[in-house]
Amino acid sequence: MSKINIQFTLFSAFYSPLISVMTGGFLAEEGLDYEFSVAKPGVTALTALDDGSADVVQSTLSQGFSVLNKGLTPTSVHFGQINEMDGFFLTGRNNDPNFSWRKLEGSEVLVHHGGQPMTMFKYACYRAGINFHKIKVIDAGNGAEMDTAFRNGIGKYIHQQGPAPQQLEADGIGKVVTALGPVIGPCGFSSLASRPEWLETEEARAFTRA
């Protein structure tokens, strides 16, 4: 049985299609074994493709933008969709059934400053008809640091990927007031990536079938 190495940029229930492929026996049905890992905070899983430690990774499409902006050709290829909606939510301090995006203007909001999350948040603001620059945006660090900051009383709202917002609710810290996905609409959010040469292998074809 061939073994493939899979790496996640972030490990979250949001990537359940990929997790299910691993844990549901679909890879085994195609004669594949697997090992998986999670990239270190702040490091894209695409790095694991370049150094050979992973065969296939979960990655946002935007992680190739910086290379393209330099006029270079990305070394990896995005070949399979994981999901097609933004998986981030806004959580407030209190339940707000009458929430509107306009309430963000003038409020302190902990916003995820990762490349794609920030870009998508700005686009959601545009789609919702509000001025991003009127929001008191707080950069509290990575996802875990943001979560800690909000739990410690910083910010009126926080922008997080599921299931972190739902955990805040379960812990009595806040209430989810809206999701970004419906505001933005369908988009290429997260996908599978690999190197072109691996995609020519029988293992790659078996993985894609799974």
Model-derived segments and spans:
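Short, glycine-/small- and polar/acidic-enriched structural segments
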Residues: 2-130, 137-143, 156-163, 173-178, ...
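Pocket-lining segment of extracytoplasmic ligand-binding domains
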Residues: 145-210
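Short, surface-exposed acidic
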Residues: 132-135, 201
